[in-house]
């Protein structure tokens, strides 16, 4: 018995020594002291650490929206701050939400937007400007020509908009002035004060290019996009407008005009791009004298010759000017000046059917009556939209519901024409907000 007890004790001792040896070997392989955080817990902290904010460099990230960052990008590929080429400055000006301030955008890259508002056009004008600010990227300067009685209210309303929007534009208020002829006669020509647009090249002498719109215009995509059409001008073109009608044989000018007009159907001046520098420097052919005349010196004699024959005021005068100078006009598609005439007799704007409406022109007073409820629904949706709300939830979805109530009208039967561009614009704005402000996952 004693021998067996000794053998058992020796066996237990040997097992204890072997166990100690194994524990010692394991300790050498894993020297982490107790209490050190486990590696799997530390790794996500490194993976999701905030990316240092760098000044944007557009030429290093063309088309960055929707693109994933590469895994473990080498430091040498990071964009260097403060070295953008001159060609990339325009891209910097166009991107909303960038860390770079809009105030640093060079003035020559600003969009200049002009409007003339008299009488009861205050609300319409503010809604138009709101649509421009909601969707556009580049900084804008608003040139608002209005009566003295309306100036304080314009200034008050625009300054009440949120800072996130007011930083995107500056506004200037101008009196209604006509440099030649009888001011009262010009003021009463067609709509109140509309003839003011004819004198913009002489008044805005420090502005190179300009987009003029009527008060009843709404932008359904960034103003930047129509501004780009200036680049498509050839060496002789100095203004751009859309046709008055897409089907000449049923158009107004081709059937009723008693004066010369551009092309086969005339042009509509409710949305008008102008290269003011070229207009100021051009001698225009005319029906008054054999020699060319400068823009400003041509206006009064032209009006005096044709005033008994014109119906649509300043628009008729513009048609007469470009009848004699067709090489000076660039004609853009009807989607950039979409009016009730394009759908109330059946859809006849093919570009809008393909691309969607880009600029809506609610002439005939359709924003304020029940004749074209589709146009009125869009106007009210933008007018009533709270600036800081979600565009989809507070504008787009309610707009879809309103359109269901307009299907009994010819314009209401094609809701996709009205919604296509505004949906694309909202989606793009949402994606840019997420990518720029939230940032892509750098390790995904």
Curated annotation (Swiss-Prot):
Locate the region Disordered: 31-101
- Enzyme Commission code(s) on record: 2.4.2.42
Q: Which domain of life is it from?
A: Eukaryota
Q: Name one Pfam family in it.
A: Glyco_transf_8
The listed locations are: Membrane
- Output the Gene Ontology cellular-component terms: membrane
Membrane-spanning segments:
5-25
Quote the biased-composition stretches of kind Basic residues, using this chain's numbering.
68-83
| Class in the EC hierarchy, top level | transferase
Q: Which residues lie on this side of the membrane: Cytoplasmic?
A: 1-4
Q: Where is the composition biased (Basic and acidic residues)?
A: 87-101
What is the documented function of this protein?
Glycosyltransferase which elongates the O-linked glucose attached to EGF-like repeats in the extracellular domain of Notch proteins by catalyzing the addition of xylose.
Protein name listed in UniProt? Glucoside xylosyltransferase 2
Species the sequence originates in: Mus musculus
Classification from the root reads:
Eukaryota, Metazoa, Chordata, Craniata, Vertebrata
